[in-house]
Amino acid sequence: MASLYLPTIWASTLTAATIFIVAVLSKWLRKPRSFDVPIVGAESGDLNVLKARYVQEADALLREGYEKFKDAIFQVITPDGPRVFLPRKYAHDLKDYSRHEASGMKALADRHIGHYTTIDHESDIMLGAIKIDLNRNLGTFVGDVEHEVAFCFETQFPACDDWTPIDLHDKLLRVVAQASARIFVGYPMCRNEEWLECSTKFALDVMTGGEKLKQWHPYLRPIAQYFVPEMTRIRGDHQRALELLLPELNRRLAEPADPDSSPHNDMIQWMQDRARKTGDNSFDNKELANLQMLTATAAIHTTRLAIIHALYDLAARPEYVEPLRKEILEATKDSNGVLQKQHLTQMKMLDSFMKESQRHSPPSVATYQRKAMIPITLSNGFHIPAGTIVQCNTNILDETPPDWGDPHAFDGFRFYKLRNRTPDDINKFQFASPTYDSMQFGFGKDACPGRFFASNQIKIILAYILSHYDIKFEDSVVGRPKNFMFEVNVLADPTKMVLFKKIR
């Protein structure tokens, strides 16, 4: 009878031995590259403390690095190993490199281990569709986006006849996702519940699954990925996206050819047209579905967060509401309140408020992230080996130009006043303008190609809210809620509700 237990004993022993070896190897193989530059917080001597500080208070670490080293390069210890941070001035050195030499996309993919989370795919078709086709058609989409925004508020929000608490993180996810889908996959697909759920959950699976898988050494991730539930869901997300898109793609194929009718004006059509023009035979329905997921990931969550930050700033500073509301009403008075392209351009105070909100609550306290695809030498002689990820330490308010006014105060009309100084300034200081002093969207020729689309969406949604609702915080909230940090990412406090009340 004892012999019957031998296979079980051997299996248990082998499993235990494997777990032990994997655990030991994971620690032994985790040898981060170090650089000959000072380490912020090195005096503590405890790497685990420094890693925890980076996760919870990267803003304080980068501030400490700035105060200690000013214009010098420094490094910070992160859970992924040392990370190099450059003073803002070195953005001038990097901005002229092509994306094939210093890649923001590759840096982002590395941060989220894109080989496994599937966001490491850099497509010229997708880039062209965003950079050229989307930007070229922005004006034609204002009405469509506003229509989807209004539909979402009517169907997804409570009546708000009296002050009603709203979970902005939840509700605005739907608003931004549906407004974006109107441009990405067209109508009626933009209202497909399964598509909206698939496209919004994918980004969450990427971020959560990536963080879990990063706990394993790269040598062990090919096996470890199968023990991370989010990795399984990511593969399912891609398959489901394809299944959901196929009926729409087949419907379009079945439409009778009509030389007098315009093709569908959305991201699906632009990508298909570009694939045909370039003769890219690898572009199929599966590739189209994958790129749609990547585009949604890039567009939805950062836009939602920017709107939440702006609404928190408005609720904490109600004195801005009436001037902004008056500007919106004045801009749209000739169209009975219906938004058009030129109206967004006229909303200079709202644009200024958005930019000031972003200045105080940027998506990240370290921007202009690049992975060196070739060896790069900076103007001071510092050598960046190929494969190294660097970022610029750009969210230092003390570096604000003197003529901008008090850098630490919140002045919602700061950039409105700057734009009105002289005729030459009228087109400067806009929310979507990437400059040396404002790098939230990057800098140089490879600045975020979707920034104009994001700017329009944020402005349309904020204009709708200001035109239809009063907002305020609950009485228990004093001032503007403090942001949370996750590594270099700046997050609005998800525990706070904003009260909405419909304007009569």
From Swiss-Prot:
Pfam families: p450. It comes from the Eukaryota. Belongs to the cytochrome P450 family. GO terms for molecular function: heme binding; iron ion binding; monooxygenase activity; oxidoreductase activity, acting on paired donors, with incorporation or reduction of molecular oxygen. SUPFAM superfamilies: Cytochrome P450. GO terms for cellular component: membrane. Cytochrome P450 monooxygenase; part of the gene cluster that mediates the biosynthesis of the brasilane terpene glycosides brasilane D and E. The biosynthesis starts with the activity of the terpene cyclase braA that converts farnesyl pyrophosphate into the sesquiterpene alcohol trichobrasilenol. Subsequently, trichobrasilenol is glycosylated by the O-glycosyltransferase braB putatively using UDP-GlcNAc as sugar donor to yield brasilane A. The latter then undergoes two rounds of oxidation performed by the cytochrome P450 monooxygenase braC. It is a single-pass membrane protein. Its cofactor is heme. InterPro entries: Cyt_P450, Cyt_P450_E_grp-IV, Cyt_P450_sf. Heme binds at residue 448. Pathway: Secondary metabolite biosynthesis. The chain crosses the membrane at residues 4-24. This is Cytochrome P450 monooxygenase braC.
